[in-house]
């Protein structure tokens, strides 16, 4: 039986596909790999994928 540690269960977090693909922006992924992850595993349509990448490519603006 494993020892009980309450702090490990509270800090444990599953990474989402978004986290895995975009956590390190210095890594360049092949488009077909990203498409496979998003489309086939999450059942997201290609137009939604294109929209997501388009929105991510826009420069962020700070409004005050």
Curated annotation (Swiss-Prot):
The family assignment reads: Belongs to the orthopoxviruses VACWR006 protein family.
Entry protein name:
Uncharacterized protein VACWR006
């Amino acid at each position: 039986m494993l020892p009980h540690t309450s702090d490990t269960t509270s800090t444990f977090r599953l990474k989402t596909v978004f986290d895995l693909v975009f956590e390190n922006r210095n890594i360049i992924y092949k488009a077909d790999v990203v498409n496979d992850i998003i489309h086939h595993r999450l059942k997201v349509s290609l137009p939604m994928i294109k929209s997501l990448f388009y929105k991510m490519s826009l420069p962020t603006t700070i409004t005050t």
